[in-house]
């Protein structure tokens, strides 16, 4: 679980990187679709799945908007993400293993874009946050 220190670290990092959330989301989603091509099946209705395409940028922005919302509601991730969990479980039918794959890509991009801020301590707290976020998104699958 997230300690008070983890929560403070995540909030402090988000305060620094939040203004570039759209860029982080687009890059992370583009990477996921490239490195893990099996994830493309969920987006087959998009005309262009290549990194940097309009749909990838748009959904990357949507994803990071939800991440920002989760950061602001870090004390109740299950409650904060309940509607998204329901959407992904019952309507979109996304395999919850993909939440961890996307989270990994977001972490990679944060490390690339903010190497000075992404210390091992920050990495650990951010990783724990995304593990908890993925778990909260998986809540409706149980």
Swiss-Prot record:
InterPro entries: Globin, Globin-like_sf, Globin/Proto, Hemoglobin_a-typ, Hemoglobin_oxygen_transport, Hemoglobin_pi. One of its GO terms (biological process) is hydrogen peroxide catabolic process. GO terms for cellular component: blood microparticle; haptoglobin-hemoglobin complex; hemoglobin complex. CDD domains: Hb-alpha-like. The keyword Transport applies. O2 binds at residue 59. Heme b binds at residue 88. Transmembrane segments: none annotated. SUPFAM superfamilies: Globin-like. Keywords: Acetylation, Heme, Iron, Metal-binding, Oxygen transport, Transport. GO terms for molecular function: haptoglobin binding; heme binding; iron ion binding; organic acid binding; oxygen binding; oxygen carrier activity; peroxidase activity. Residues 1-142 form the Globin domain. PANTHER family: ALPHA GLOBIN-LIKE-RELATED, HEMOGLOBIN FAMILY MEMBER. Involved in oxygen transport from gills to the various peripheral tissues. Heterotetramer of two alpha chains and two beta chains. This is Hemoglobin subunit alpha. It comes from Carassius auratus (Goldfish).
